Amino acid sequence: RFKQSQIKAAFSVNSEMLQFYWSLGEDLVKLKAESKWGDGVIKSVSQDLQRQLPEVKGFSVTNIGYMKRFYLLYSQIDSIYPQVGGELYLIPWGHHKYIIDKFSSEPQKALFYVRKTIQNKWSRAVLLNFIDTDLYEREGKAVSNFDEALPMPQSDLAQEMTKDPYN
């Protein structure tokens, strides 16, 4: 039970941290929209946070830039599908950074890899492998007539079964 509690606590901390990163990213986007500030905003925020919270890591200029990109990428989806927000907080920040690097202008692909990571409990190495081997494209290529031949729930299930992530 102790290990279970530790795992739950780690997930809770991760979720809270990601929610903070989301809100900071949102604040940065709003600050930039309301002012004439450029990249100096991120540097200034980074320095302020490091000065106020010297014991906390993760407030480098690079990481704060990722927070802004995190918000920009997923806010496109969140405005259409608000329930997605909760999913975003279920995977580690390091996973998000790789997804952001690869799909900063492709929110649907980014969300696909977030969901696959959650469903399959992928490590960062496994996630990178599936990104590098373009799982998103491969899973969409299974050709069938299941939609015409089977009723709705069965056609979806049959289609899913033909998709091979290792192909």
Language-model regions, residue ranges each:
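Basic, low-complexity intrinsically disordered segments
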Residues: 1-167
